[in-house]
């Protein structure tokens, strides 16, 4: 022990002898720079040096004011002495940090450098072998004292993400030697994260297919459950990644997967597995252009049946009654959606329809449309052309036969005669046009002792047809010439006189038949009325025509002819409109029992109003059906609200069997029903973007209309988007009161007989005992809001009508649509309370929607709107369907934070502080130095009592500031809410300090 200092002194003696002055300067400079105690014994007024992180940071510069005459010798002393200085190393780090996403974390590394070291660079931070640049993550603090300087580099990460996982460590250079700290492993844990979700596919019926789902932690492992139509497919979980093999489906289904780990569960998006079917028939078949022998047709393909269209066929048949009904079929590719039909007859009528096919089969044909070809030039020349010379008049007589009617391709307007005269040294070509009235012409002789060549062509408005074969005749100087032979003899027509005579006799026979039939009809009329009126009496008859009748008795007789009740007659007697004032147009839409037609209603001032006419489709309708049809009109008679469709009148006409048939006249709605409008905006070839403010306005319009009806004690009982109409100004009107009822006593109506009802819009109590109240309409209004938000989607996809009651009874409700605000979903969800008394009134709903609309910004373009897709209730990250989490929490007194900076410290003291705001927190594991800190004490849960709605506070989940209950969102077979674990969803900060 005594020899060691002596040997060390002998080794240092040469260096001290040669560089004593420089060494003294070095010690003086360091004493001045790092004067004061170490952090373990810092004075009260001591303040450390702080500097942001930089890979080029140097130690603080020495203080000025002292001279150092031996400055030039310092490098030699340092270079010689550095080989004998003790090694410098970083203190032990925390080692391993485990925390949840979105928390704040801080950690550090520290080092003690004696005054004997002079060439020291700053501390740099590295992650996974790459240097972290930038000064916003770390701060370096210096603590100088008499013996040296202690350096602490702090590193912080705000709201950690999974990308922050990795190994962090410090680096610095001391006397050109690189020193590396122990690594600090940061592990960010959270709910499972999907890296591959199931994808929607279109499959053939009863054909197997696969779905893949893959999610990762940490923490691992991640288990996968598959869900089909809200029911689990596999009872035992599968390790991620998981591949589900479905043997085959017969109907459309919705699949999703649940990823579970120790932090909770995450639910993937639901994907639709569609069954391929035959396509729908094409629509909007139009004629783009037509010529004499071709027609250009276009169409819009129908729904492809979840399989690409392969080709289409155009079916063409003649529309003339005399045609044989044969159909010509032209096949073409599915795209482009147009085809030119050729080889058609000119000036003919055709019926055209289109059908398309996919891999499953052919669609039904589209509705037949009528098309016509235009007039064309004749396709053949006139026949039987003869030419002879009339020598007395010095003219040529030319005769011919008209082309066949089917080959004329139009209406003949005349003929063009071309005659060429040739003689020795003379050539003359002339042409003349004659009318179509005759089939002969005369032309003067132009040249004698010459040859004349004659050709004739027929003319229509479509053009000039081909010329006939030439007919030559020789014109002598003074001699008689017989007529030239026929140029184009008609086959089978050797004698045209017989044909003309036959046609003449036929016309005479037809005329005789018409005369006889008229005489017989007149005789029958005279026999029918007999001699009731003599010629003298008939002069005393006054003929008049009533312009309009206001006789109440006449109206009663008209309504009585329908056989309806007297009460209904009294309700409708003042709204019956004369049939002559109504002009019907095209059919706008058809249902199972009726149709809606476009019409024009003449007003008293001579103008006309465009209206919609609702008729009964069937001719063999029963008396009860007529009563129900007119009862709907009676319901609307007294309505006067801008958001409720009003009745314009009732009209009666005779059906094809001579039976009176009622028609209800309503205002014309330009945009049709709301459901079709929303559906086309989402599924059309060019989707129309609808602002959220517009959707809210639709809901407010319906709420105002239903508020008006409920205040008048009317139950609609069939409120849905399909029964709401859109006016020209985009105002929604509540319509279709076929199931409406007036409540005269009490506040409910019980349905007596069984009728067709919209099951997916009916409240749960109405499904159970067929009792309807205004709160039943509130339930349907919530479903209608869901339809509007999803832009026309069908409620409860994958759930059959006969399953609806059990589905609702187990607490299931419509899920929150994508891009739906939480506040909006709150409003619609309140409409589906199991207890009707807990549902809001339409007045409250209107006020809530108006308040929500006022809080939203003005409508913007689609590109500038950002939607935040919140998680669905069933997949909320606050629910964990797995084993209980281990109650290991790091809960250390913040006053015990100690920075161990003394160079002689044998063990680095590691302390951690975790700020907790939630009693239910996940586990933290922190390893520091040679000690492992574990606080196994868990905070007990406070006693809770049910709230006023019977739901315990722990059964509620706060998401985006809104409280949700699990009772109405858990799938069938799930554990009770008391068995569910709540995964931490807070954003409280947590920091770990060395």
Curated annotation (Swiss-Prot):
Source domain of life = Eukaryota
- What start and end residues bound the annotated signal peptide? 1-18
Query: Tissue specificity, please?
Result: Expressed predominantly in the hematopoietic lineages: macrophages, NK cells, NKT cells, dendritic cells and platelets.
Residue sites binding ATP per the record: 588-596, 610
Q: Which Pfam families match?
A: fn3, ig, Ig_3, PK_Tyr_Ser-Thr
Record carries keyword Transmembrane: yes
Q: Fill in the PTM field for this protein.
A: Autophosphorylated on Tyr-744, Tyr-748 and Tyr-749 in the activation loop allowing full activity. Autophosphorylated on Tyr-867 leading to recruitment of downstream partners of the signaling cascade such as PLCG2.
Question: Quaternary structure?
Answer: Interacts (upon activation) with TNK2; stimulates TNK2 autophosphorylation. Interacts (via N-terminus) with extracellular ligands LGALS3, TUB, TULP1 and GAS6. Interacts with VAV1 in a phosphotyrosine-independent manner. Interacts with TIMD4; this interaction enhances TIMD4-mediated efferocytosis.
Q: What is this protein called?
A: Tyrosine-protein kinase Mer
Source organism of the structure: Mus musculus (Mouse)
């Amino acid at each position: 022990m005594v020899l060691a200092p002596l040997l060390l002194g002998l080794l240092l003696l040469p260096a001290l002898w040669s560089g004593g002055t420089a060494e003294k300067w070095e010690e003086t400079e360091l004493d001045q720079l790092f004067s004061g105690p170490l952090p373990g014994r810092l004075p009260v007024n001591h303040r450390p040096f702080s500097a942001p992180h930089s890979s080029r940071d140097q130690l603080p510069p020495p203080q000025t004011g002292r001279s150092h005459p031996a400055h030039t010798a310092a490098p030699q002393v340092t270079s010689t002495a550095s080989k004998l200085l003790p090694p410098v190393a970083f203190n032990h780090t925390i080692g391993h940090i485990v925390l949840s996403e979105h928390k704040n974390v801080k950690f550090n590394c520290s080092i003690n450098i004696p005054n004997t070291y002079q060439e020291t660079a700053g501390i740099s931070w590295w992650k996974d072998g790459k240097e972290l640049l930038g000064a916003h993550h770390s701060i370096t603090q210096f603590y100088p004292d008499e013996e040296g300087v202690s350096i602490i580099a702090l590193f912080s990460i705000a709201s950690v993400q999974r990308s922050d996982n990795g190994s962090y460590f410090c680096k610095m250079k001391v006397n050109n030697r690189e020193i590396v700290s122990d690594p600090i492993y940061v592990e960010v844990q959270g709910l499972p994260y999907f890296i591959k979700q199931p994808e929607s596919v279109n499959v053939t019926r009863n054909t197997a297919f696969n779905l893949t789902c893959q999610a990762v932690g940490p923490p691992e492992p991640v288990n996968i459950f598959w869900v089909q139509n809200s029911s689990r497919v596999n009872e035992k979980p599968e390790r991620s990644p998981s591949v589900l093999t479905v043997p085959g489906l017969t109907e459309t289904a919705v699949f999703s997967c649940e990823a579970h780990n120790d932090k909770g569960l995450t639910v993937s998006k639901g994907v639709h597995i569609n069954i391929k079917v035959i396509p729908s028939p094409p629509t909007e078949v139009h004629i783009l252009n037509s010529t004499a022998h071709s027609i250009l047709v276009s169409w819009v393909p129908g729904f492809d049946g979840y399989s690409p269209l392969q080709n289409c066929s155009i079916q063409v048949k003649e529309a003339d009654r005399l045609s044989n009904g044969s159909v010509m079929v032209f096949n073409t590719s599915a795209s482009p959606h147009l085809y030119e039909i050729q080889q058609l007859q000119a000036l003919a009528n055709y019926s055209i329809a289109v059908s398309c096919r996919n891999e499953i089969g052919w669609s039904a044909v589209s509705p037949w449309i009528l098309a016509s070809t235009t007039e064309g030039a004749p396709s053949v020349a006139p026949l039987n052309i003869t030419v002879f010379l009339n020598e007395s008049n010095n003219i040529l007589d030319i005769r011919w036969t008209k082309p066949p009617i089917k080959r004329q391709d139009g209406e003949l307007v005349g003929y063009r005669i071309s005659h060429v005269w040739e003689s020795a040294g003379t050539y003359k070509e002339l042409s003349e046009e004659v009318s179509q009235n005759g089939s002969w012409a005369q032309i003067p002789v132009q040249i004698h002792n010459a040859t004349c060549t004659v050709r004739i062509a027929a003319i229509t408005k479509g053009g000039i047809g081909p010329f006939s074969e030439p007919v030559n005749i020789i014109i002598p100087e003074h001699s008689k010439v017989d007529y030239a032979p026929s140029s184009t003899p008609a086959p089978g027509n050797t004698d045209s006189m017989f044909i003309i005579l036959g046609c003449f006799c036929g016309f005479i026979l037809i005329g005789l038949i018409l005369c006889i039939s008229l005489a017989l009809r007149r005789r029958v009329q005279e026999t029918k009325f007999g001699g009731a009126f003599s010629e003298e009496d008939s002069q005393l008859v006054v003929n008049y025509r009533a312009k309009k009748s206001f006789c109440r008795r006449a109206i009663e007789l008209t309504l009585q002819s329908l056989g309806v009740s007297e009460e209904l007659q009294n309700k409708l007697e003042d709204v019956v409109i004369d049939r002559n004032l109504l002009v019907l147009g095209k059919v706008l839409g058809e249902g199972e029992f009726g149709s809606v037609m476009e019409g024009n209603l003449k007003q008293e001032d001579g103008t006309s109003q465009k209206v919609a006419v609702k008729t009964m489709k069937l001719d063999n309708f029963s008396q009860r059906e007529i009563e129900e049809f007119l009862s709907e009109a009676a319901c609307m008679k007294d309505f006067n609200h801008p958001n409720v469709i009003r009745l314009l009148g009732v009209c009666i006409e005779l059906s094809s069997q001579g039976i009176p048939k009622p028609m209800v006249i309503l205002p014309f709605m330009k945009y049709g029903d709301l459901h079709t409008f929303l559906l086309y905006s989402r599924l059309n070839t060019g989707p129309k973007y609808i602002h959220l403010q517009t959707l809210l306005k639709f809901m407010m319009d319906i709420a105002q209309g239903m508020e008006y009806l409920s205040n008048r004690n009317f139950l609609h009982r069939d409120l849905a988007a399909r029964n709401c109409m859109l006016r020209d100004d985009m105002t929604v009107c509540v319509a279709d009161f076929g199931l409406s009822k007036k409540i005269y006593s009490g506040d409910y109506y019980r349905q007596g007989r069984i009728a067709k009802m919209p099951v997916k819009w009916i409240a749960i109590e109405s499904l159970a005992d067929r009792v309807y109240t205004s709160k039943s309409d509130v339930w349907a209004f919530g479903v209608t809001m869901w339809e509007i938000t999803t832009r026309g989607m069908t409620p409860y996809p994958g759930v059959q009508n006969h399953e609806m009651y059990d589905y609702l009874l187990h607490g299931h409700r419509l899920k929150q649509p994508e891009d739906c605000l939480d506040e909006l979903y709150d409003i619609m969800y309140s409409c589906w309370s199991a207890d009707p008394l807990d549902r809001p009134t339409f007045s409250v709903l209107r006020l809530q929607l108006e308040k929500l609309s006022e809080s939203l910004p003005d409508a913007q373009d689609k590109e500038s709107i950002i939607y935040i897709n919140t998680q669905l209730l069933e997949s909320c990250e606050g629910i964990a369907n797995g084993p209980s989490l281990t109650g290991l929490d790091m809960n250390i007194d913040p006053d015990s934070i100690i920075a161990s900076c003394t160079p002689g410290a044998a063990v680095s003291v590691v302390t951690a502080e975790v700020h907790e705001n939630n009693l239910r927190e996940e586990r933290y594991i922190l390893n520091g130095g040679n000690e492992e800190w574990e606080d196994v004490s868990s905070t007990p849960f406070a006693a809770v009592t049910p709230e006023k709605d019977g739901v315990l506070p722990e059964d509620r989940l706060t998401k985006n500031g809104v409280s949700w209950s699990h009772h109405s969102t858990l799938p069938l077979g799930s554990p009770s809410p008391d068995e569910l674990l709540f995964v931490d969803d807070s954003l409280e900060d947590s920091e770990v300090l060395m």
